[in-house]
Amino acid sequence: MRKFFGTDGIRGKVGAGKMTPELALKLGWAAGRVLSRSGTKKVIIGKDTRISGYLFESAMEAGLSAAGLNVMLMGPMPTPAVAYLTRTFRAEAGVVISASHNPYYDNGIKFFSNDGSKLDDEVELEIERELDKPLTCVESHLLGKVSRIDDAPGRYIEYCKGNFPAEHTLHGLKIVVDCAHGATYHIAPSVFRELGAEVIAIGDKPDGLNINHEVGATSMGKIRETVIGENADLGIALDGDGDRIMMVNRHGKVIDGDEILYILAYDAQSRGVLRGGVVGTLMSNLGLDLALQELDIPFDRSNVGDRYVMTMMKEKGWRIGGENSGHILNLDHGTTGDGIVAGILVLAAMRRRNATLEELTENIKMLPQVLVNVRFEGAHNPLESEQVLAAKSEVEALLGERGRVLLRKSGTEPLIRVMVEGDVEADVIKHANYIADAVRNLV
């Protein structure tokens, strides 16, 4: 049974619960104890732009050093950059200090293994077992040293650009790039400019407190307004740590992760490089499933969370997968979700087919889907109550084969997520609220 790690590392409000300086220190030490048993004894740490990142960086650094591991600090860098540089520096692991799309007052800690993928569940459980032990320190001559990777941004910018075909440029495209005042603020605009695009950057002025605030992949109003107001060709919105992407076409319509998966799968199929099918999640829109069926591309669903998408992709030997929230995995172009690289791959598909973003998505029709989040912090599970199960069954009977209902607990926040999709938006909204009310009655 996990005490600390959720579906995406450890996350919570700074100074409360799990996310304290004391835990970060102990976590660094415990992880160092596990990771020092083999390998290079070298760990990379990156973070996003929230103000508490400095605090947790120092604590993790001290804990890892106390366990005898050398630490390399990247400063503010996107999560996928940590995964990439962990591989290229042959480090034993990478550490990301970020709460992704959450507000500034939250933070989190997650790990990458030496191949740039998320740590296995077994390794996380081993770290948790070490956390129960008293903290000790190696002999002074065995303490880890700390250094900085000063050229980390340049290394990652070149890596991102390398995913765009050399025979094409982005010359003539006007792109709005929303960095969510997060870890991509000094990376993403440069990547797309150097590939030839005219870039209008927003959300690129972090102050430690404004990460994800009314900007980024979870708040699309600003980028939609900017794309339309600037007469741009498209917009690319990233989240606070840069592992998620949402897009906007020239008319201001949001293009979500499901539609991006469709574009990438169709492009790979047309070039004869698609291996297998596409992995989505239980939250993926039924419209993606139906559109891929038209292309004879297999589709399967994993549990929600990019680590579970990755697990299913590896089991099936498939190369493309992701979530409608914008985590996009393409194992031919990286080991984890990468918002910038996913955007580059969509732009590459546009250039290869000489098509607009609207044209690339014209054959996928998304069904109306409503997600209602209900805050729930009780000890019992409302999803097992007769009242909620009865409401779910009632709605499923009304929707028939042209709709779905999904109820689940969030793995990162104290929320029950109620998702309903079907043909008629008004009915979908009504059904989702009906089930959500059944959950609220138990709070």
UniProtKB/Swiss-Prot annotation:
One of its GO terms (biological process) is peptidoglycan biosynthetic process. The keyword ATP-binding does not apply. Pfam families: PGM_PMM_I, PGM_PMM_II, PGM_PMM_III, PGM_PMM_IV. Its cofactor is Mg(2+). The active site is at S100. The keyword Cell division does not apply. Keywords: Isomerase, Magnesium, Metal-binding, Phosphoprotein. It catalyses: alpha-D-glucosamine 1-phosphate = D-glucosamine 6-phosphate. Activated by phosphorylation. It comes from the Bacteria. InterPro entries: A-D-PHexomutase_a/b/a-I (IPR005844), A-D-PHexomutase_a/b/a-I/II/III (IPR016055), A-D-PHexomutase_a/b/a-II (IPR005845), A-D-PHexomutase_a/b/a-III (IPR005846), A-D-PHexomutase_C (IPR005843), A-D-PHexomutase_C_sf (IPR036900), A-D-PHexomutase_CS (IPR016066), Alpha-D-phosphohexomutase_SF (IPR005841). GO terms for cellular component: cytosol. The modification Phosphoserine is found at S100. One of its GO terms (molecular function) is magnesium ion binding. Mg(2+) binds at S100, D239, D241, D243. Its EC number is 5.4.2.10. Binds 1 Mg(2+) ion per subunit. It is an enzyme of class 5 (isomerase). Catalyzes the conversion of glucosamine-6-phosphate to glucosamine-1-phosphate. Belongs to the phosphohexose mutase family. This is Phosphoglucosamine mutase. The lineage of its organism: Bacteria, Pseudomonadati, Pseudomonadota, Gammaproteobacteria, Alteromonadales. The gene is glmM.
